[in-house]
C-alpha cells in the first residue's frame, strides 16, 4: 500500500504565545564546561531567585557564578555602575582568580541601557583579567540561545591564525635555529611545515567532555583531526580561528555563533545535519569528510550496529505519534531522529527557525520522511499554545514533548508528556548516546504499559464514570 506524501515541508508562523526558561539559565551548564571561568549575572532580584531555584546550587557551595544585583540606586543612576562592578570584579579576582570573567546582561540592563561593552575593556585593563560581555537576556526566543550569545562573544577572543608571511618568518627562524642539524633533518622539518599549512577543523557547541571526546574520536577514525572546540574546557585553550579554519556546529541553536565565526573571524562554515541519533551522526561525519575530500570508512556498518542495539526501544515507539510543542530549538533534529525510528510526527513547534543554519537538517528531515513513507510534519514557528492544545485535542498524539509549564495540564487531559528541557541536559549527541534519547522518549510509554499490566488504567476509567 503506497502512502501519498507531500514533497515539501510546510512552514507556518503564529503569534508566539509560548512559555520558556530565561536564557540566563545557560550559566547552569557553561560554568561547569569552562572550568577556569566565573559568570557574573548583572540583573534584578528576579534573576537571582531564578538562578538560585532553577539551578539548585546553594550559596555556601560557592559556585563559579554570582549575581550583581541591581537596586533602585543603580536604576535611577544615583550610583556609579563602573565603580560597583569594579568592586565586585576585584573581589572575584581575590577570592577565585579565574582566567576569564563573563558578564551576563539581563532584561534590566537592556532597558536601562547599561553600557557593559563600554565598561568591560577599561575594567579589564585595570584588573588584568579578560572580561567577556554576553547579553543573554529574556528577549531571546528560547533559553538555549543564551549559550549562543556567550559563544558568539567568546569567538571574538579566540587567537588569530597567523598569516602566510608570519608563518614564513617563524619557519625561517626555526630553520636558522636548527641550522647545525644534518640536511636530512632539515628536509623532514620542511615537510612538516608544509603539512601544517592545510585547513584545520574547529567544532563549536557546549557538550560534556565525554561526548566531545566521542565525537572527536569518531572523526579521528576517518583521519580528521579536531584542532579545537568552542568553548574549550579552559579559557586559555580557546581554538585558533582564521580564513584557513573550517567550523562546524553540534547544536541547532548556535546560528549567532556561526554568523560571528563566518563574518567576523572569516572561518568557513560546514553546513551539516547535527550529530543527534545514528542517522544524524553519520550524515554529520560524512559532510565533514566530503569537505576534506576524505572517503568515509566503515561508517554505514557503524550506524547499522547502533540501530541493532536499539531494537527493543524501536519496537516500543514504532507506529506511535508525537507532537512537539516547541521549547529549546532541538525540535527539528529530534523529530527527524524519531521519524527514522518509525514514529509519526504530527507537528514540530519551534520558537525560532534559522532556515539557513538548519538547511542541511531540514533536507535530512525531508529525506527521512520519504524513506520512511511518512507524511511531512508541519513546522510551526512561534506556535500559539492555545491553538496547539486545540490541535492536540483533535489529533490525540501518543506523546507530547513540551515545556514544563504545559506538562501537568496536558497530563490531566490524558496526553502523555515529556519535558523538552530533559533533552537539553541529557547526553544525546553521537552514536553511543542515541539510546539515551529513546530512553527519555519511551519512559512515559513504558510507564503506561506497566500501569495497564497492573490494572490501574481500568480502575481510573471506572472511577471517572
UniProtKB/Swiss-Prot annotation:
It holds the Pfam family Oxidored_nitro. Its cofactor is [4Fe-4S] cluster. Disulfide bonds: none annotated. GO terms for cellular component: chloroplast. Binds 1 [4Fe-4S] cluster per heterodimer. The cluster is bound at the heterodimer interface by residues from both subunits. GO terms for molecular function: 4 iron, 4 sulfur cluster binding; ATP binding; metal ion binding; oxidoreductase activity, acting on iron-sulfur proteins as donors; oxidoreductase activity, acting on the CH-CH group of donors, iron-sulfur protein as acceptor. Its EC number is 1.3.7.7. It catalyses: chlorophyllide a + oxidized 2[4Fe-4S]-[ferredoxin] + 2 ADP + 2 phosphate = protochlorophyllide a + reduced 2[4Fe-4S]-[ferredoxin] + 2 ATP + 2 H2O. CDD domains: Pchlide_reductase_N. It is an enzyme of class 1 (oxidoreductase). Its main location: plastid. It comes from the Eukaryota. SUPFAM superfamilies: Helical backbone' metal receptor (SSF53807). The keyword Nucleotide-binding applies. InterPro entries: LIPOR_BchN/ChlN (IPR050293), Nase/OxRdtase_comp1 (IPR000510), Protochl_reductN (IPR005970). Pathway: Porphyrin-containing compound metabolism; chlorophyll biosynthesis (light-independent). Keywords: 4Fe-4S, ATP-binding, Chlorophyll biosynthesis, Chloroplast, Iron, Iron-sulfur, Metal-binding, Nucleotide-binding, Oxidoreductase, Photosynthesis, Plastid. One of its GO terms (biological process) is photosynthesis, dark reaction. [4Fe-4S] cluster binds at residues 22, 47, 107. It is found in: Plastid, Chloroplast. Belongs to the BchN/ChlN family. Protochlorophyllide reductase is composed of three subunits; ChlL, ChlN and ChlB. Forms a heterotetramer of two ChlB and two ChlN subunits. Component of the dark-operative protochlorophyllide reductase (DPOR) that uses Mg-ATP and reduced ferredoxin to reduce ring D of protochlorophyllide (Pchlide) to form chlorophyllide a (Chlide). This reaction is light-independent. The NB-protein (ChlN-ChlB) is the catalytic component of the complex. This is Light-independent protochlorophyllide reductase subunit N.
